Amino acid sequence: MATIFDILNTLNNNNNNNFENCKRQCSTNKSNKTIIDILPPMDVTMTNDKLIIETELAGISKDHIEIDIKDSILTIQGEKKKNLNKQQQQLVIEKSSTSPSSSTLDSKEDEPSIEEFEDDIKPKSTTSTTTVSTTTTATKENKEDENKTKPTDKKFISERSFGNFKRYLDLTKVLYQLDLNSINTQFENGLLTITINKKLHYPNPIKININ
């Protein structure tokens, strides 16, 4: 019968080397370009009647957490998003609203080509100079407005981590003992608890006759 040490052996081969553990569990294939930024700590406990998996996910909304079991592998993944203050949110909105639209980019195709200006260069050179001057003035005004809207907050310490997280747990050696229909999850105070009950009765052995 498999013990808790069997699944812990596949979970972490060296508890004293977190870097190697992260590199092993967070490695992705070439086709998957998702970068794992956070390796949340995990506790796994096997009791007489259930398997308990606890994962610390402080500062993460339950809407940003995904849990699934595929090919005997339990996967906990999601994203810890950075909270923006009102001033930073306003900057994001302004940048998105001032970005060039497709209609603006398409209108450049209707602008006259340089060959059309060659027929009458002198009169249009003055107009061109005036346009450049006006554009320069408008650009300076835009830069002044951007400087006014830049956040004035100064961050002295930044130790919190944000981004994607992912943890794997290989249940192959104990899966036959578990009742997957009894999976229960609870997320409270930043702690995700997954409970899987053991099967009440193992099936009786089946005798096979030889013909």
Curated annotation (Swiss-Prot):
Biased composition (Basic and acidic residues): 140-152
Top-level taxon of origin: Eukaryota
Residue span(s) of domain sHSP: 33-211
ATP-binding listed as a keyword: no
Keywords from the UniProt entry: Stress response
Segments of skewed composition (Low complexity): 89-105, 124-139
Stretches for region Disordered: 89-152
Signal peptide (UniProt feature, chain positions): none
Protein family per UniProt: Belongs to the small heat shock protein (HSP20) family.
Name under which the protein is recorded: Small heat shock protein hspG8
Organism field: Dictyostelium discoideum
Gene: hspG8
